[in-house]
Design a protein with these regions (language model features):
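Alpha-helical transmembrane segments of multi-pass membrane proteins, especially transporters
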Residues: 4, 32-36, 118
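Conserved active-site and cofactor/substrate-binding residues in soluble primary-metabolism enzymes
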Residues: 9, 13, 58-61, 65, ...
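Short glycine/serine/threonine-rich phosphate/pyrophosphate-binding segments
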Residues: 11, 36-42, 63-64, 107-110, ...
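Rossmann-like adenosine-cofactor binding region
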Residues: 78-152
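Adenosine-phosphate binding glycine-rich loop
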Residues: 130-194
Length: 194
């Protein structure tokens, strides 16, 4: 089971809950801080659901490198966007229906004012459980909770599925010693459990 620092199970749980809440096919999805392990996997899983995906980074170079790495591993290249600050990230989410925040602890990637009245945003998910959260205006415990007319999922809201998924995958490994569970397999399992 490949799950470095929980990156596959975290991304899988978040995207599976988004997909359960609403179809992602044809939606524009932005992964904020999409150059880390959770963000890159979330981008791939959003793509599996048929979303048009972009990833942001503070650095265009890092965004380009992550897009290439995602393409090398998953066979599609998300649009790389440099979004150095909150203003640039607010501009990046304009026109998106899905926002997935995968940033580090203690960094707000998107202020509440930048998404609460946006007419196109339908779904927001945040993997950061420690305040300040990655997306302002949602709570870590949100699990498909309506906020400002949008569906919000917080880190603890997806955490239950993440732990259930992790246990199920580890249990599956005891059934046969010759299997490999990577991002795609783990995501399929997350969808079944969501």
């Amino acid at each position: 089971m490949l799950d470095s620092n929980g990156s596959n199970t975290t991304a899988a749980a978040g995207v599976a809950l988004l997909a359960k809440a609403k179809s992602l096919a044809g939606k524009k999805a932005i992964v904020l801080a999409g150059t880390g392990p959770v963000g890159m996997r979330a981008a791939a899983m959003l793509h599996i659901e048929g979303a048009e995906v972009a990833i942001t980074s503070r650095s265009k170079q890092l965004a380009d490198a992550a897009s290439k790495a995602i393409n090398d591993r998953f066979g599609f290249a998300p649009t790389p966007i440099e979004a150095f600050d909150n203003e640039a990230r607010a501009a990046a989410v304009k026109g998106a229906q899905v926002v997935f925040a995968a940033g580090v602890i203690g960094v707000t990637l998107l202020d509440e004012k930048d998404w609460q009245n946006d007419p196109t945003i339908e779904l927001v998910a945040d993997c950061n459980a420690q305040p300040p959260l990655g997306i302002g205006g949602i709570e870590a415990i949100d699990k498909a909770k309506e906020r400002h007319g949008k569906i919000a999922i917080g880190a603890l809201g997806l955490g239950g599925l993440k732990l259930k998924l992790h246990r199920a995958c580890v249990g599956q490994l005891f059934e046969s010693a010759d299997q490999v569970l990577d991002a795609e397999n783990i995501y399929a399992q997350a969808k079944a459990l969501a």
